[in-house]
Amino acid sequence: MEDVNQEKKKVPPMSEPERSTPIKTTGGQYRFCKSCVEGSSCRTVRSRTKLMNVLIERGRPHEAQTVFKTLAETGHRPSLISYTTLLAAMTVQKQYGSISSIVSEVEQSGTKLDSIFFNAVINAFSESGNMEDAVQALLKMKELGLNPTTSTYNTLIKGYGIAGKPERSSELLDLMLEEGNVDVGPNIRTFNVLVQAWCKKKKVEEAWEVVKKMEECGVRPDTVTYNTIATCYVQKGETVRAESEVVEKMVMKEKAKPNGRTCGIVVGGYCREGRVRDGLRFVRRMKEMRVEANLVVFNSLINGFVEVMDRDGIDEVLTLMKECNVKADVITYSTVMNAWSSAGYMEKAAQVFKEMVKAGVKPDAHAYSILAKGYVRAKEPKKAEELLETLIVESRPNVVIFTTVISGWCSNGSMDDAMRVFNKMCKFGVSPNIKTFETLMWGYLEVKQPWKAEEVLQMMRGCGVKPENSTFLLLAEAWRVAGLTDESNKAINALKCKDIEIAKLEKLYQKQSSGSSFNLLQIPVGKRELPTAKAMNLSACKLGARVPIICQKQSQAQFGISGQFVHSCTVFLS
């Protein structure tokens, strides 16, 4: 209602300089909006400002900026609400550099400022951590006779927390309490923001002091309050205290009961600490309290049991999911499938894949890549390529699965097949990356055809992919393995980075050459059981720190997957 009243206020008429600058319309005519020139409320400005708010709410703040620009371009003058909304759009996008200029523009226009505008300014500065300018805005606000609200102080408290100064946040709370003004009294958000500020610095005891003061002021801590402190304990590696000190208090509170978020915080903490059994125990405890874990929680448990090679634990989680009527998605299937695949149990992995399709869950490129990678490890590149063909028909394969299949043929020494898949990749419109080219170069190294590796390097440049130091080192090794030392030295000399310790690298090559082969993928050895996270990762190319098949993002995603599992999944673990 306050916004509506603000919009109806008479806007100052355009100044003489503004009047003297005509605006060209799409029809080629020059005009001004009569309402804007006279300082009256303009319907167009109101409607476009409303549109800006809608765009921000829908997560499209950049479009809100564009709408704002069209106001002036079409002969309209933005209102104070327009500028306030623009500030909100800039803040969401973290474009803090223009805040001061926007404030100056509004002040120069002669528009009468209000507390809503100043709150937006203070919020923008606070979000950026620029508390000096945020405080200056507060002082200017008071100079103009505008009273700060509880929201104003909450924003400043949050800002000092962002700036890593919770002590100043506490001082502001004390100031609010000392003033005794009902209009600016602390509320639940005030205290929660301050708790968050202390927890950000991992000062749990200070956070508990805020909770104590909160209760003394007659404000009841809520679930957000306790979840924030629980998160702090988890980040400190003290998940046991999160359960014993935080959750126990929540259980006793009427209006701050544990929820799904609480469950996720504690279970995630136990899993990160390697105490997956405690995580499973906690989920069962929450189930008894009718707080059911969500998909993320269950998948964290599955992933945790995979890392500690506990197949019985995985089975227990899947059974519990069935009891909770939680269904699987592609990520959960991928987690279990990856465990079997990495351990070398390709029949089990393929069975999980079939069950996923049977359950109506559509495999994504990552799921296909996991299975293809397993076949490559098992020296079955033909099956890996069959998966690729299926993916081409049903979806769109990415560079990862193409490179995985190429590496499979390279591992078998079938370079004609590797190049055939490479050409298919290009024909399909998937751009090869440096890992693709280095995989081919490694393949030619294995079959002792360094001149072919040289051709791949030229092809790489032709595709606009810039070679890296590892590329030249790979080429040098290809020539060296073929017994052509002079050509190897030429490749090393082509390195642009002169600070590389060539002697150390050559020593590394000598050590690696003592092995039977230059393996691109690490084949599981020893006991055929669920591997640890490290064992499940593809090994780096032997020439250096490069993972040839899986990009960093996907490699991380393998062990940070979240999701859920179907009722029939337990059969795969028997």
UniProtKB/Swiss-Prot annotation:
ATP-binding listed as a keyword: no
Compositionally biased tracts (Basic and acidic residues): 1-21
Cross-referenced Pfam families: PPR (PF01535), PPR_2 (PF13041)
InterPro entries xref list: Pentatricopeptide_rpt, TPR-like_helical_dom_sf
Region feature (Disordered): 1-25
Coiled-coil features, chain-numbered ranges: none
Domain of life: Eukaryota
PPR repeats: 44-78, 79-113, 114-148, 149-183, 187-221, 222-258, 259-293, 294-328, 329-363, 364-394, 398-432, 433-467
Keywords in alphabetical order: Repeat
Family as reported in the entry's similarity comment: Belongs to the PPR family. P subfamily.
PANTHER family from the UniProt entry: OS01G0228400 PROTEIN (PTHR47931), PPR CONTAINING PLANT-LIKE PROTEIN (PTHR47931:SF1)
Protein name per its UniProtKB record: Pentatricopeptide repeat-containing protein At5g25630
